[in-house]
Amino acid sequence: YGPKGIGALFIRKGVDLKTIINGGGQELNLRPGTENISGIAGFGLAISKACNNINNNMLYLKNLENTFIKKLNQNKIEHVLHIKDRLPGVLTIGFPGTDGQSLLIALDLKGIAVSFGSACSSGTTKASQILLDSGINKDLAKSTLRISFGKIHKSEDVEYVAEELSNIINRLKK
């Protein structure tokens, strides 16, 4: 909800961060280049607005998640929610016995944008190494999608996605 190309990094005390881009001495020698002042200002405003309503926003996103999962359950769609401690509104969810890439393509044809695997592995057809390293077996990792909801979504949107996803899974399993 803020400008692209800008962000913040919280570094836990005691963590030794190494630079990955060499150059000038800006940002404590961690990232070279002139700071994007307008991006920083926009990011600050976005954070301020998000924090003003953080509890309401989190509750809204959790309600959307619950609506989505409830609809999958009503449709008797087997699923595995991978990450318990996560950002509200972002589901990493596996559908055993279903190919995640096929799901992604079929959903895309319906105008529904999701991602395959984890954020670290988007753009690849291989099982996400992050999911594998967290103990998820390869077959389940290959059936995993990342689905995100935001404040622009309504309950009807989430129900539509769950219904279309259910229809696609049932069709693929025939």
Task: Identify the residue ranges that each predicted region occupies.
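Pyridoxal 5′-phosphate
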Residues: 1-174
